[in-house]
Each structure stands twice: as C-alpha cells, then as structure tokens.
C-alpha cells in the first residue's frame, strides 16, 4: 500500500490555505465586519439571572408542555434494542473506568453489540478515502505535489465526480434522488453484478439504508390494519419503523434447526392468519444475508420467495446491505432483482425495493451515512409520491452519495489503485471469516449453547439453554432471561452483546447477538473471558 507522506501533505494544505487567506485579505468588504464584542460580566450575570428565573417559573408550572402522556404514543411504542439498556450500562461503565480502573475485573469495554467496524479498528479503504478527500478539499487538485501523494485513478475519479456536482461543491444540495452521474455509476454497478439492466432513475440515494426503509414504511402503512411480514429474529429497525408509522408487524419465524431457513409454508401460515384478523399485508421484508442470524439464502429459496410475493401481490423489501459479507464457499449472494429477472419477471410483474448501504460490506463506513434503494415495479403515479417524499428531505449528504457510487464502481484491473484495493478488501473479508469461525467454534463448546454456522453478515446469534434457576432469577428481577445473562456478562467481562429478546424470537427460547468485528488479535481474549464467565454462570445457576 502506498505510504502517505504526512509532512508533505501538511505543507501542501498549509500552502493552499495561505493563498486563500491572502486572497480574502484583499477583499474590501472584510473591513466592514465589526469585531465581535463579548458581553460584560454584568450583562452575563443578568442573562444568567433571567434564564434562571425563567426556568424556575417553568419548573413551578403545574402544566408542562410535553410529557410522556402528551407525546406521540407511536414513539413510545417503538424500541431499538441494539442501543438499549445494555449499551446504556456499558457507556456508564466506560466513563467510570476512566477514574476507577481498579474497580472492575476488566480494563476496557468491548462493544460487540452493533455492526460498526471502524469503531473497533477496521481501516477504511484507501481509494475511497482518497477520492473523498480530494472531492471535499478541491484545492488539493490544483497542487502539483498531489500527484505524489494520491493515486492517479483517485485524482481522475475525483475530477469526474466534481464535474457532476453543481458548482463542484460537496456542500451544495443535489437532486432529491441524488446526483445523476453518481446514480449512473450505481446503476452500472448493479448491471455488472446482476447481468440485467438497471435504470439510474430507479435509484434513490439515502443517508444509509435506514431512511429508505422508513420511507417505504411511510408509503405503505396507512393504519394499524396494514401489516408487514418480517423475519423473526429481525433487525429492530423493522419493528421500530412499523410501530412508528402505525402499522402491524406480521412475524414469520426462521427455522433455527435448519440454519435459520426461510420456509414458504411459514410465510403462507402467517399471511393467512393476519388476513383472518382483518390485516392487509402490504409487503414482505427479507434480510439477506441475515441480521441477526447470519444465514445466506439459496437461489432456489429466493425463487420461492419471489413466486410467493408475485402470487400474493406483496411488495418485496430486500435488505441486501450485507451482500459483500459471505464467508462460506458453498454459499453466494444473489440479489432478489437478479433472481426475479432470471425467472422472467419484469417491471410489471413484481414490486421490488432493494436496499444497499456503505456501512457494511468490507467498507464499514457507518458514520458517512451513505446508501440507496433501487425501486422497481411501481406505477408512475406512485413513483411520483416516492419522489415527493425524497424531496421533503431535500437530498442525502453528498459524501455518502460519493461513497455509495464508489462501492458500486471500485477500481478495476489496470487502475493505479487496483492491487492495493484488492489487498485491502480481501484482507478484511478473510479476517472476518476467520473471526466468525473462531467465535462460532468457541460458542459451540460452551455448556448449553448452540450456534449455527456463520455464513454471512457480521453476527452470530447463539441459543442459550439456560437452567431453570437462572430463568427464575431473571423473573425475580422482572427482566428477560437473555437480558439477565447479557447484563451479567457485561458486568463480569466488559463484553457488550444484545439480548435476543430485542430481536424477537420463538417464545421460550433465549439468544444473544454478538458481532464478529473486534480486531482479530482481540478475539482470543474475548473467547477466554466469555468462556470463564459462562462456566461461572452455569456453576451458579445449574439446576
């Protein structure tokens, strides 16, 4: 990988800034701006006193303007366990560790609760960040030294992208669906992946995949009589967004015994049951590869799902954000659009929305908030309403848009960055596969724990066969048994995982979700801590 010469880069930026400052000093209007005058001590005291009086008056009021009784009840109903109680406890422990290092049997909090790769040490892809840097600070493109610091293809790509942005400014608003040239690149990437045409006008760029999911829920749900079929266990975004928009989650249970299989008979059963209760089921959500379950659907299974949606008149919501995260040789990712087109289904046969994000895969750019949804099979008048919803949000952020285009159009053979890009990509994915295998094997060695094969995504979802005494202890604390286990695990080891009850599960079963994202050199220590804790827990509560 090319070494980035820090000193040269700093000098380059400083030179550019000095030129800009010299330019601004020559502008006559600068002298017209009055100097900032800080308030005097007396005025500060007056402001503070007035503020305190106002607050006291407000506090003494018998009627507060906002209470839990007066806010939208749908907000109270929605929950997001991935950042719930366990994480709140972890954050308090992390703060306390700064001043009370000897108070706990661990020296750090290890967050295995959320798919946030770079927070746990994963490095970004160099080519992606070079292009972002050049697009964000365009003055670098005018410096001769830039060619010694950045790859030639990142410079070329940055110029190409900037030419497509109004005013060549990444701080400007874009078209509500996203910059047209970037949507062209994404459509080309989809076509290269699937072997079927993709239309840039079907692409709606979003701040990660989550806003796209919310947008579709808002579009499809009119009342609690509208239902969305969701996999159980499910990613809490779905239950939360359905609750927030006032709909009904219609569960279909994945079969843990068959590696979290998706059975069409289960879909039919739950659909018929919902309809018998007067619920109009509008859509089927499928997460592939699975979150939190980590399974990868077979192409044959996907064909059955497509047929089911076609026969029942359901919108297929395909959450495909982990499409790059497949770790076993006998499984391969196939997009639902590719499967549908290979079956002969065209635009008029199936309403399909596919979601992609820059947060997952091998890139892990969660904080950049980039993603898109590809919307196909909707009538023109409905598409106009989707566009209107996108317009209300003005546009997604430009850096996220750029990244979304880059993950779908990375360096190709012969490009200056290709070899380093492939080395970084393969290094990350192969390491994730090793971590997944190590954790899977360790979990299956624990007493009363079973864990399905980690085929893809970023998670393991082991089943806890807890002793009755542990279940009774949890009931005494008025909490779910898996939540009880996870809290004890956190306080004993500093390891943060998410209780399975936060994802929903077959009644009477208990699980937790654990990411495979801590850096590879930390995995052995995590295994040791987890093993020691679990043995102690079972010794304490064994029937």
Curated annotation (Swiss-Prot):
PTMs per UniProt: The N-terminus is blocked.
Region Disordered, annotated ranges: 43-64
Expressing tissues: Mostly expressed in roots and shoots, mostly in vascular tissues, and, to a lower extent, in flowers and leaves.
Pfam family, one: Aminotran_1_2
Pathway info: Photosynthesis; C4 acid pathway; Amino-acid degradation; L-alanine degradation via transaminase pathway; pyruvate from L-alanine: step 1/1
GO cellular component, one term: mitochondrion
Knockout consequences: Strong overall decrease of alanine aminotransferase activity, especially in roots.
One GO-annotated biological process of the protein: response to hypoxia
Regions of compositional bias (Low complexity) in chain numbering: 43-63
Modified residues (N6-(pyridoxal phosphate)lysine): 360
Chief location: mitochondrion
Cellular localization per UniProt: Mitochondrion
Catalytic activity from the UniProt record: L-alanine + 2-oxoglutarate = pyruvate + L-glutamate
InterPro entries: ALAT1/2-like, Aminotransferase_I/II_large, PyrdxlP-dep_Trfase, PyrdxlP-dep_Trfase_major, PyrdxlP-dep_Trfase_small
Modified residues (N-acetylserine): 56
Induction behaviour: Rapidly induced upon low-oxygen stress in roots and shoots.
Transit peptide, from-to: 1-55
Entry's family note: Belongs to the class-I pyridoxal-phosphate-dependent aminotransferase family. Alanine aminotransferase subfamily.
Role according to the record: Is the major alanine aminotransferase in roots that catalyzes the conversion of alanine to pyruvate. Involved in the rapid conversion of alanine to pyruvate during recovery from low-oxygen stress.
Quaternary structure and interacting proteins, as annotated: Homodimer.
Protein name per Swiss-Prot or TrEMBL: Alanine aminotransferase 1, mitochondrial
């Amino acid at each position: 990988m090319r070494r980035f010469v820090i000193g040269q880069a700093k000098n380059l930026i400083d030179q550019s800034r000095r030129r800009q400052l010299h330019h601004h000093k020559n502008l006559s209007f600068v002298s017209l701006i009055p100097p900032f005058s800080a308030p005097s001590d007396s005025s500060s005291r007056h402001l503070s006193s007035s503020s305190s009086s106002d607050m006291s008056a407000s506090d003494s009021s018998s009627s507060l303007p906002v209470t839990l009784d007066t806010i939208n009840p749908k907000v109270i109903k929605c929950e997001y366990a991935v950042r719930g109680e366990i994480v709140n406890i972890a954050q308090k422990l992390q703060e306390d560790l700064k001043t009370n290092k000897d108070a706990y049997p661990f020296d750090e909090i290890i967050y295995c609760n959320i798919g946030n790769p770079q927070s746990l040490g994963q490095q970004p892809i160099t080519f992606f960040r070079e292009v972002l840097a050049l697009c964000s600070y365009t003055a670098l493109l005018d410096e001769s030294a830039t060619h010694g610091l950045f790859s030639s293809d990142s410079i070329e790509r940055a110029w190409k992208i900037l030419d497509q942005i109004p005013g060549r400014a990444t701080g400007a608003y874009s078209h509500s669906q996203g910059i047209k040239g970037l949507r062209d690149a994404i459509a080309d990437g989809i076509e290269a992946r699937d072997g079927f045409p993709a239309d840039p006008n079907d692409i709606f760029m979003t701040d990660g995949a989550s806003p796209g999911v919310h947008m579709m829920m808002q579009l499809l749900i009119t009342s609690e009589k509208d239902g969305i079929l969701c996999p159980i266990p499910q990613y809490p975004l779905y239950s939360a967004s359905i609750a927030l928009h006032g709909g009904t989650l219609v569960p279909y249970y994945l079969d843990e015994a068959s590696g979290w299989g998706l059975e069409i008979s289960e879909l039919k059963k739950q659909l018929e049951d919902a309809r018998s209760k007067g619920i109009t089921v509008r859509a089927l959500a499928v997460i592939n590869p699975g979150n939190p379950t980590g399974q990868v659907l077979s192409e044959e299974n996907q064909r059955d799902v497509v047929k089911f949606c076609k026969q029942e008149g359901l919108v297929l919501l395909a959450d495909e954000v982990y499409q790059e995260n497949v770790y076993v040789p006998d499984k391969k990712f196939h997009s639902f659009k590719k499967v549908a087109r290979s079956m002969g289904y065209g635009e008029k046969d199936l309403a399909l929305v596919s979601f992609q994000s820059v947060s997952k895969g091998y890139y892990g750019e969660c904080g950049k908030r980039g993603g898109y949804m590809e919307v196909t099979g909707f009538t023109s008048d409905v598409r106009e309403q989707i566009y209107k919803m996108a317009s209300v949000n003005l546009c997604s952020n430009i850096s996220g848009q750029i990244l979304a285009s880059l993950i779908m159009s990375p360096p190709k053979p012969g490009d200056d960055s290709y070899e380093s890009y492939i080395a970084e990509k393969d290094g990350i994915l192969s390491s994730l596969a090793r971590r997944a295998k190590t954790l899977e094997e360790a979990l299956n060695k624990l007493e009363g724990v079973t864990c399905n094969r980690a085929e893809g995504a970023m998670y393991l979802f082991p089943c806890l066969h807890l002793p009755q005494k542990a279940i009774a202890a949890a009931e005494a604390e008025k909490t779910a048994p898996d939540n009880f286990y996870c809290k004890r695990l956190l306080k004993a080891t500093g390891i943060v995982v998410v209780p399975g009850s936060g994802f929903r599960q077959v009644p009477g079963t208990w699980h937790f979700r654990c990411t495979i994202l801590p850096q590879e050199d930390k995995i052995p220590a995590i295994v040791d801590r987890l093993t020691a804790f679990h043995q102690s827990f079972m010794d304490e509560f064994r029937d």
